[in-house]
Regions:
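N-terminal hydrophobic/helix-forming segments and targeting peptides
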Residues: 1-185
């Protein structure tokens, strides 16, 4: 597997704060393939120890986090849309984006956020602003709350951005999972 393919595989795993199991499983598989025996802490962290062949070698730790921004469903409105609370938060990445809603039963449901594009506000006297969390509407195209419930959607389900890793002219900007990439590539 080429380096870019490894980076792409890891960065496209959807995992928000408190729901990093899919990344942890990937790392476990990769670490075992590299000959390490992964261990886990009580908070969901994963680590390995590599013993040096050199006596009295310095100890080095590479630490990384596995999560990314996301949301948790706090309510389902009568019209079938959702309101959320943040799990990590960057308001600039929300409006008009695609997300995946993960139900407690394991279903993955595509959802989008609504937003009014700034160019439609020109001439209205309204200045575009960063949305408040309470104003963000997540829509899975359900007719109503009952239909959303039929699909297994409930309070406490998580919503994570759906992203694609691309190789741009100058390379992808990596922040959240850079340390994690270093540990397994």
């Amino acid at each position: 597997m080429e380096l870019f393919d490894k980076v792409k595989a890891l960065t496209e795993i959807q995992a928000t704060s408190g729901f990093e199991g899919s990344v942890r499983d990937y790392l476990k598989t990769r670490m075992i393939a590299l000959g390490y025996q992964p261990e886990f802490d009580g908070l969901g962290g994963i680590f390995v120890t590599k013993t040096s062949k050199v006596a009295n070698a310095p100890r080095i730790m590479i630490a990384a986090h596995m999560d990314e921004v996301g949301f948790m469903v706090s309510s389902i409105k009568a019209d079938g849309t959702f309101r959320v609370v943040p799990l990590g938060w960057n308001p600039l990445v929300v409006s008009g984006q695609r997300f995946t809603l993960f139900t407690r039963t394991g279903k993955k449901i595509p959802v989008v956020t609504g937003g009014l594009p700034p160019h439609l506000l020109r001439g209205t006297g309204v200045t575009p602003q960063i949305p408040a969390i309470s104003d963000i509407v997540f829509d899975g195209a359900f007719e109503n709350a009952a239909e959303a419930a039929e699909f297994g959607i409930a309070q406490g389900d998580v919503i994570i951005p759906e992203t694609e890793t691309i190789l741009s002219a100058n390379g992808k900007i990596l922040f959240l999972k850079l340390g994690t990439i270093v540990t397994v590539v």
